[in-house]
Amino acid sequence: AVLDEALIQTYAIKDITPDSDFSSKTPPVLSDLQNILEGLTGAESMAIRLKKYTTGTFAGFLNMPTNVPLDNNLVVFSIRDMEEELRPIAMYSILNHVWTSVRRVQKKRLLIVDEAWWLMKYDIGSEFLLNIAKRARKYYLGLTTISQDVQDFLASPKGRPIITNSSIQVLMKQSPAAIDVVQQTFNLTDAEKYYLLEARVGLNQSQ
């Protein structure tokens, strides 16, 4: 309830309400929310936790308006060099931005999520990705998730439903430690199982 009230007040200071036309208004940033929380009884701890995202190391990424247009034919978001603590937050923020744009302007798109297991480690992230997997077709969106380790991906209860909602599944060479899980998950025959164990890396199998 405290956070809900803080969010309402944060948008209100920017003259943004549920009934207003806010398309031309500047949206608030995290530091605006922090300022409101500091003045609300019982919200002091939340304000303190936000501080490292508004004035600390991560402020340059999170405490600013979104400025990435999605109009180009190819848009790449790289989080490779981010601190490990920030990666799940960054991936979630990026996917949320993309998903909002997809629903607002409907046209054929392809969303590729590499290292998807990072997002699957967190309940809110896996739930979000499953929601996209189930609803993407409605908005002319194709979703591709990529993960090097099936076991990490399936560690989340949402992993198998995401795979089930995939119309095409591509399997590369697998490690002996993971092959039994892969066989069970994808209903592979023994021949297919051993093919994945013996497959060469980066070479045409006909060579």
Where are these regions (language model features)?
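Ser/Thr-centered flexible coil motifs
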Residues: 1, 83, 175, 189-191
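P-loop NTPase motor domains
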Residues: 1-141, 145, 154-157, 197-202, ...
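Short glycine-/small-residue-rich flexible loop motifs, especially phosphate/cofactor-binding loops
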Residues: 133, 160, 180
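A short beta-strand-to-loop transition that corresponds to the Sensor-1 phosphate-sensing loop
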Residues: 146-150, 173-176
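Conserved H-loop
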Residues: 150-154, 162
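A short helix-turn-beta junction within AAA+ P-loop NTPase domains corresponding to the substrate/partner-engaging
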Residues: 158-171
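Conserved AAA+ ATPase core "coupling" helix
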Residues: 176-184
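Phosphate/diphosphate-binding loops
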Residues: 184-200
